[in-house]
Amino acid sequence: MDNNNAFQLSFDEQHYAWLAIDVPGEKMNTLQAAFAEEMQAVFATLNEKRGQIKGLIIHSLKPDNFIAGADVRMLEACQSVHEAQALASQGQQMFQQLADLPFPVVAAIHGPCLGGGLELALACDYRVCTEDEVTRLGLPEVMLGLLPGSGGTQRLPRLIGLLPALDLILTGKQLRAKKAKKLGVVDACVPHSVLLDVAKRLLEEKGHKKRAQVTLPIKEKLLANTGLGRKLIFDQAAKKTQQKTRGNYPAAQAILEVIQYGLEKGMHAGLEYEAKRFAELVMTRESKALRSIFFATTEMKKDLGADAKPAPVAAVGVLGGGLMGAGISHVTVAKAKTSVRIKDVANDGVLNALNYNYKLFDKQRQRKILTKAQLQAQMSQLSGGTGFVGFDRCDVVIEAVFEDLKLKQQMVADIEANAKPTTIFATNTSSLPIHQIASQAQRPQNIVGLHYFSPVEKMPLVEVIPHATTSDETIATVVTLARKQGKTPIVVKDCAGFYVNRILAPYMNEAAQVLMAGEPIEKLDAALLDFGFPVGPITLLDEVGVDIGAKIMPILVKELGPRFQGPDVFDVLLKDNRKGRKSGKGFYTYKGSKKKEVDKSVYKLLKLTPESKLNDKEIAMRCLLPMLNEAVRCLDEGIIRSARDGDMGAIFGIGFPPFLGGPFRYMDTLGLTKVVEMMNQHTEKYGERFAPCDGLLTRAGLGEKFYP
């Protein structure tokens, strides 16, 4: 066969067929519609030699991946539901031909086996995977606002049972090898070195027979194989899905309906319905927005933020053993695989940071993600003290001390005195201008802002903030480090609030205005949850800390003007020691680590009588419009480099609803004329803070959009 083909078929002397997958010119194997002709030639050869073949082994020639999924770019070419349905049907037919082969087929899996890759493997009789860390199996289509469209919704429940299949497909979670074996997704997990040998031996052990129908556990039979049991499962799943998605993600409901339809009407009807619903989802606004995030994330992986080669980073120093410092040290060791030296003014601070890391690693050990030896190996990469011992080896030092300008300037001086001349100093400030922190530095070209979000091990965004004389190499180095830490970095201009806090502040201020107008706290939070935010603004203030808000807002008012002046609630709350969760009381009451309910006494403190006057949409738009306005100002002032960066920063930094694609894509969807119209209406009703900025007015007048 042609070596330029993605699928290469060969035969060994024992009459086994081997189908190797190697998409030419690509790092990852993906399935593409253009491969259909190749696969038809493969099936023709296999059927022609059917009497001589004992079995077929499918494997990848890529060193670290099986099939990462279908090429999502194919969907962008679909102009109609009909075209998208034809695409899904083509994939289904190809995998059905694989399932219908008269001899057994085994998929030998190493590396990611996701989406269409797993659907191909599910069409095989058997599956063997490596136990390597790189091996992951899953159906993540729901993350793109889709459902598995090549048989996944029909084959997975029949293989492992309805309950575990619903969990995998609705969440899009990816399984490690041992978990996949435990659930029955694969038949064996083995060392990489023997993968192909074991795959072939499995066919021999099975007597070269096709797989018999899987026998599911008795509980699964009672629940999923009876009409009443199925109804109970799907009713419960629909209820949980609605609670989680609040109706904003149509793919989740479609997944439930397609799986239920297939179990009740049979495999053939289920596949037809799967293709139909898949196609409908492809054309939805939600899926298009989620796919735009996927493409943007992929693009950003190649973006170093500057035209320079990043310097190697073999060791990192962290100043401050608090929550931020501990989290930064964790992602550096766990994700970036780089050793860390922690410095704190007190031994207790260092011990707290080490203990924080140990607890996170131990959770992974308890979940069988790490062995005890691996946990110890990770902890051995962490050390610390109250002095600067070891900092002469650090290539990057990340500062996470208190938000005090003089203290941070002293940290710069200390590192310049105790580290290499080439050491980069990255400050994790959330509000102080980077040029001020660098103002007394001997080597200002090595200084850059690196703003993480709390908790660091969970929040995916980091803002990289160069000041006027930060070198391109410094920018490229910290962008590369942040990406290795598992973060999505965006490069933003050095100004008050940077980007994320600057667009968050007007949103939070308006939420406070709505509250002070008498809207009940729970109503206000629920309105933004329904809109698609992960938490409501009042809950967010409690989580971040009222004291943090009280520090940031005056800086923004001083630097950017009176539109950042919110209602005077911070001082009143802080006088009553209401800092939020950290102090055990804020707008909500807390018991241990759990939020309980609205603390009704806060109304009396703020001299309010709660009374609902606005509907949910009115509340949401009041909070959202100032954020959209400020995002446009940030773009026009060069705070962010593009609408893409602005959207990714909002989604990954503050949880802007992903199904809307970010503030800029959302404005494009609404139409800028409509956005201006809404802002003008709010200006008349609530004041000048809603007046649309010049950039919005100009674009709306010219009929422009933020994206082509």
Curated annotation (Swiss-Prot):
Q: Its pathway?
A: Lipid metabolism; fatty acid beta-oxidation
- Superkingdom as given in the UniProt entry: Bacteria
What Gene Ontology terms for biological process does this UniProt record contain? fatty acid beta-oxidation
Per UniProt, subcellular location reads as: Cytoplasm
Keywords for the protein's UniProt record, in alphabetical order = Cytoplasm, Fatty acid metabolism, Isomerase, Lipid degradation, Lipid metabolism, Lyase, Multifunctional enzyme, NAD, Oxidoreductase
Q: What is its EC number?
A: 4.2.1.17, 5.1.2.3, 1.1.1.35
Region called 3-hydroxyacyl-CoA dehydrogenase, residue ranges = 311-708
InterPro entries in alphabetical order: 3-OHacyl-CoA_DH_CS, 3-OHacyl-CoA_DH_NAD-bd, 3HC_DH_C, 6-PGluconate_DH-like_C_sf, ClpP/crotonase-like_dom_sf, Enoyl-CoA_hyd/isom_CS, Enoyl-CoA_hydra/iso, FA_oxidation_alpha_subunit
What positions are marked as the site Important for catalytic activity? Answer: E119, E141
Gene Ontology molecular function terms on file: 3-hydroxybutyryl-CoA epimerase activity; enoyl-CoA hydratase activity; long-chain-3-hydroxyacyl-CoA dehydrogenase activity; NAD+ binding
Its subunit composition reads: Heterotetramer of two alpha chains (FadJ) and two beta chains (FadI).
* Described function: Catalyzes the formation of a hydroxyacyl-CoA by addition of water on enoyl-CoA. Also exhibits 3-hydroxyacyl-CoA epimerase and 3-hydroxyacyl-CoA dehydrogenase activities.
Q: Which HAMAP family match?
A: FadJ
Q: What is this protein called?
A: Fatty acid oxidation complex subunit alpha
